[in-house]
Structures are given as structure tokens and as C-alpha cells.
């Protein structure tokens, strides 16, 4: 067992709170969080911080309300702000955790706290690693809990992570009877599995934590060795070995934590990228992968209503801006080689719109579906999405796509009545 002074001596050089002045402490009332509360209260002047307390009453035990009342009384006595939330809904470990962290985040944002501090220690770290092993987690997820990570508008800090539970002083706290319920995996790991494994190896917890540390260093080294590679560049990606591609893609997917692909889905995704066939491929949870001839990216699916681009009607002898172009019936005074001009054989209004299913354009002796035109000419999906179709009298007279313009072939007896001029708008 250590004293608070000894704990302070060990963590002061880690400068956890160097960039923070107001920190929020997650306090359940258990021995770990009560130690954290007392420690930070005693050393807040030396750490140059001011603290607040955040407590969630899960309403699952008869003692919950008395624990909340005690913490409110303690906070009032010590002139510390306290924020309390009552859990609502169907209770589960995940639902409770999501509720807590959503509450902590909201308090930080509303009250200008730049850090959330929790009382996780090395025993919690070992439990987490063993739970992930049991669940069959990927190698990169065996890195365990980080002592500092981004959270809300600041950071989540775990200053006790290098200490074990037995290092913490004895202090008044509340015993949570639900910690003995074996219906929860963490409780089975803590109360059943770890004690048995420690009989085989008394240093089993230290071994799990060392595994987490080495695993974290391994992926840090991989990131440093591959940071010159643009993962989403298909040429660069496919120049790498299969093993490097595997971990590059895993690293890229870390940017989409709620995507949560199963191992079989990850394998399918990797194969899609390796084949590099252009198109959209649905993944899950409203995500899809978008592949063109140069690159790939993962993004949220856009609702169909948002994919319908705004249409505009261009009347003869008028002008308008549509997307990145300026349409008019008057040429520029100076000869602009970048200006597109389209012969018109009718003075009817022209509808400017996106491509629609079934669209085709006549090239004289033959017609071609615009979809097939895009494929044959190898336009990227982004270029296809931004293509502009000009329709007059129910017939497509031009297609503006990428840096090319395709015109309807005029009939033999058509008489040109005017010209439509198109200029690319300069982006400021």
C-alpha cells in the first residue's frame, strides 16, 4: 500500500495536468474513485488544477440513493461542484457505460472542463486485456487502456493506470454488491478467471500489462514506418505486401470506430480494395466504400434525397451559375480557350440537372446511355456525380463531365439559332 504522497511523487513527472486547469472526476463511490477524489483534492494546488465531481446514479441497487446523497454532502462540505445524472432505460453494461460517458462529455462541454479523470488502475487494464482475448479481439485491440486519450473537448486521463489496486490506500467507500454478480463478464474475469490464472503464475497480471505495452509499441512502430504511405491511394496501397496492406487497412479503419467490421467483413473489404473495381460497395451501419481509378475512401451513405441534385431552368438570353459553372448566351469579350460553346437549334428553356437512370445522348447514327459513356471513358465516380446534363425540349443536348463536353449530334436540316457559353468558375 502506498501513501498519496508516494503516488504523487511517481506521477508528477508525467505532467498529466500540465495543460489543464479545470478537471472533472468520475466518481462512483467505490474504493478506486474515492481514492482518486481524495488524491486530487489533496494535491490540486500542487497540480495547479481545480476539480469537479461527476456521478451517475444507475438506480440498480437500494444503496444507490444514499451513495448519491453522501457524495453531494461531501462535495458541499469541501466546496466542490458536483454533477449528478440518473440512468434511464434498459440496463446493461454497455448501456450504462454509454450513458456515463455521454453525461461526462456534456458536463465538460457545458462547464468548461478540459479533462475527465477516471480511476482505472493496472488490475482494470489486465481485466480488459483478458476480456478482449476471451472475446477474440484483434491484435491491435490488445493494447489495452491508454493513460491519456482525446475525449470530448479535451482529454480523458487515467493517472492510476500504472498502479495496482493493492497500491491504493484504505479509504471510506461504498461496496457495490453488483460487482459480485457473475452474470457480467468483467465480474467473472475479476472474481473467477484471474484468481485461477494467478495461481498458475503469480505475475499473470503484470504479464498481461506487459503484453499490452509491447503491443502498443508494436503498432506505434508500424505507424512510424508506414507514415509515408497514403493508404487510400490505390497505387501506393497495392505496391505493398499483403501483410502490410492488412495492417494499413486496419489502421485506416480506426478512423471509423462505429463501423466495427467483423473479421470476415474485413477480409471481404480488403479483397474489394485489392481488386480495385470502381464503384460503391455497401459495408454496414450506413457506411460504404467508394472506389475510383485512383483511390478509395469510406464514408457514410448519403440518403437518396440528398443525392438528387438541384435542377435549374435556364431561359434564353439570361444567365446563371450552376454548381461550378457560369452559363450565358453572350461570349466573353476576350477569346477564352477555356470557354465551352454549345450550338442551339431551339430557343426553348434548358434544364440543367444531374444524370438520371435511363439517360442517353444521340451521336447521330447511334445513341449511347450516359451511364455507359461514363464507364467507357473511365470517369471517376466523383466526376460522374458532378456531371451536368443539359436537356432541351425533352432531349439531352450536352453532357459536361470532368474536363470534357459531349454534344448531341445535330440533324441534317437543323438551323443554329444561338450559342450557349459555359465558363468554369474560379474558386476563391
Curated annotation (Swiss-Prot):
UniProt binding sites for ATP: 28-33
- Keywords from the UniProt entry: ATP-binding, Cytoplasm, Ligase, Nucleotide-binding, tRNA processing
List, alphabetically, the Pfam families matched.
ATP_bind_3
A single BP term in Gene Ontology: tRNA modification
Q: Which residues form a coiled coil?
A: none
Indicate where this protein resides in the cell.
Cytoplasm
Main location (coarse class): cytoplasm
Q: What's in the GO CC field?
A: cytoplasm
Catalytically driven reaction(s): cytidine(34) in tRNA(Ile2) + L-lysine + ATP = lysidine(34) in tRNA(Ile2) + AMP + diphosphate + H(+)
Supply the InterPro entries for this chain.
Lysidine-tRNA-synth_C (IPR012796), Rossmann-like_a/b/a_fold (IPR014729), TilS/TtcA_N (IPR011063), tRNA_Ile_lys_synt (IPR012094), tRNA_Ile_lys_synt_N (IPR012795)
Entry EC number(s): 6.3.4.19
One GO MF term on file is: tRNA(Ile)-lysidine synthase activity
Q: What is known of its domains?
A: The N-terminal region contains the highly conserved SGGXDS motif, predicted to be a P-loop motif involved in ATP binding.
**Recorded family membership:** Belongs to the tRNA(Ile)-lysidine synthase family.
Function comment: Ligates lysine onto the cytidine present at position 34 of the AUA codon-specific tRNA(Ile) that contains the anticodon CAU, in an ATP-dependent manner. Cytidine is converted to lysidine, thus changing the amino acid specificity of the tRNA from methionine to isoleucine.
Specify the protein name: tRNA(Ile)-lysidine synthase
| The organism's taxonomic lineage, starting at the top | Bacteria, Bacillati, Bacillota, Bacilli, Lactobacillales
Amino acid at each position: 500500500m502506498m501513501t498519496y504522497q508516494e503516488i504523487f511523487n511517481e506521477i508528477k513527472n508525467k505532467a498529466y495536468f500540465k495543460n489543464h486547469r479545470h478537471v472533472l472526476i468520475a466518481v462512483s463511490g467505490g474504493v478506486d474513485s474515492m481514492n482518486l477524489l481524495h488524491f486530487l483534492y489533496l494535491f490540486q494546488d500542487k497540480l495547479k488544477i481545480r476539480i469537479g465531481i461527476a456521478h451517475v446514479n444507475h438506480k440498480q441497487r437500494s444503496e444507490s440513493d444514499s451513495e448519491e446523497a453522501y457524495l453531494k454532502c461531501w462535495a458541499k462540505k469541501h466546496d466542490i461542484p458536483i454533477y449528478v445524472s440518473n440512468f434511464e432505460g434498459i440496463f446493461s453494461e454497455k448501456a450504462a457505460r454509454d450513458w456515463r460517458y455521454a453525461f461526462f462529455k456534456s458536463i465538460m462541454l457545458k462547464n468548461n472542463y478540459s479533462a475527465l479523470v477516471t480511476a482505472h488502475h493496472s488490475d482494470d487494464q489486465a481485466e480488459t486485456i483478458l476480456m478482449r482475448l476471451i472475446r477474440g479481439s484483434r491484435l491491435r485491440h490488445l493494447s489495452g487502456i491508454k493513460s491519456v486519450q482525446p475525449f470530448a473537448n479535451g482529454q480523458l486521463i487515467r493517472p492510476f493506470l500504472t498502479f495496482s489496486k493493492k497500491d491504493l490506500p484504505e479509504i471510506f467507500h461504498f461496496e457495490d454488491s453488483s460487482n459480485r454478480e457473475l452474470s457480467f463478464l468483467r465480474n467473472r474475469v475479476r472474481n473467477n478467471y484471474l484468481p485461477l490464472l494467478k495461481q498458475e503464475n503469480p505475475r499473470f497480471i503484470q504479464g498481461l500489462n506487459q503484453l499490452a505495452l509491447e503491443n502498443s509499441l508494436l503498432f506505434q512502430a508500424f505507424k512510424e514506418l508506414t507514415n509515408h504511405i497514403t493508404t487510400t491511394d490505390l497505387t501506393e496501397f497495392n505496391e505493398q505486401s499483403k501483410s502490410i496492406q492488412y495492417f494499413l487497412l486496419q489502421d485506416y479503419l480506426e478512423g471509423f470506430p462505429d463501423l466495427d467490421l467483423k473479421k470476415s467483413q474485413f477480409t471481404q473489404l480488403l479483397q474489394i480494395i485489392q481488386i480495385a473495381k470502381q464503384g460503391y460497395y455497401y459495408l454496414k451501419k450506413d457506411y460504404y466504400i467508394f472506389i475510383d481509378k485512383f483511390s478509395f475512401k469510406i464514408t457514410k451513405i448519403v440518403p437518396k434525397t440528398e443525392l438528387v441534385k438541384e435542377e435549374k431552368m435556364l431561359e434564353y438570353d439570361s444567365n446563371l451559375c450552376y454548381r461550378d459553372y457560369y452559363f450565358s448566351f453572350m461570349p466573353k469579350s476576350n477569346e477564352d480557350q477555356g470557354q465551352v460553346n454549345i450550338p442551339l437549334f431551339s430557343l426553348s428553356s434548358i434544364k440543367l440537372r444531374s444524370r438520371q437512370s435511363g439517360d442517353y445522348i444521340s451521336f447521330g447514327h447511334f445513341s449511347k446511355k450516359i451511364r455507359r459513356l461514363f464507364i467507357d471513358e473511365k470517369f471517376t465516380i466523383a466526376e460522374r456525380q458532378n456531371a451536368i446534363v443539359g436537356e432541351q425540349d425533352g432531349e439531352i443536348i450536352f453532357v459536361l463531365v470532368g474536363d470534357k463536353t459531349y454534344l448531341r449530334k445535330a440533324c441534317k436540316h437543323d438551323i443554329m439559332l444561338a450559342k450557349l457559353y459555359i465558363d468554369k468558375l474560379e474558386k476563391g
